């Protein structure tokens, strides 16, 4: 059983020459993306397409961006990632619509065994990460293998997300935990007790 098959079926695998050859082609495309964005956005998106990344419209990664394969990533529409986004996509990473990443957000689908002898044998693994719709992940957050983040979620800056997060909550911390529910009462406010002015509020309610 070859290691590309093992990797793609969520089995323990070793990064042999065949695996590394796939990464090499992606690194070329991502290097070009980081060089041309934001000055030549159409060319930049062509670079992402070369990796095999599946994405809808209005997808943007502020450079520098890093991923290992690209072909394992699916991104919904209206996605924005600030600088230094890292996706270790040794398997599937799925991101919904209307998702925002702060700077230095990392999705670590990859991992290694905890026992030293198993780890030293060079085996690694990848477990899927899923992020729902209407999610904002604050700066310097890490999302670890196997995590599912629900819809309409805010993850506070600096969080390490080790477990699933349900829909409609604010969560933060290391390890990340639910702080409170998000309700309709939050809609008129943009920060703590600061309300939107009339012009901004009217624009929000146009939709």
Which residues does each PLM region occupy?
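Short secondary-structure boundary/capping segments
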Residues: 4-5, 51, 121, 128, ...
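Terminal amphipathic alpha-helical/low-complexity segments used for targeting or macromolecular assembly
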Residues: 1-58, 176-207
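Conserved catalytic segment of ABC-fold P-loop ATPases
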Residues: 150-153, 166-168
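Short arginine-rich
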Residues: 34-35, 164-168
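Flexible, glycine/small-residue-enriched loop-and-beta-strand segment within the central core
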Residues: 65-75, 80-149, 174-175, 181-191
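Short-chain dehydrogenase/reductase
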Residues: 60, 100, 136, 154, ...
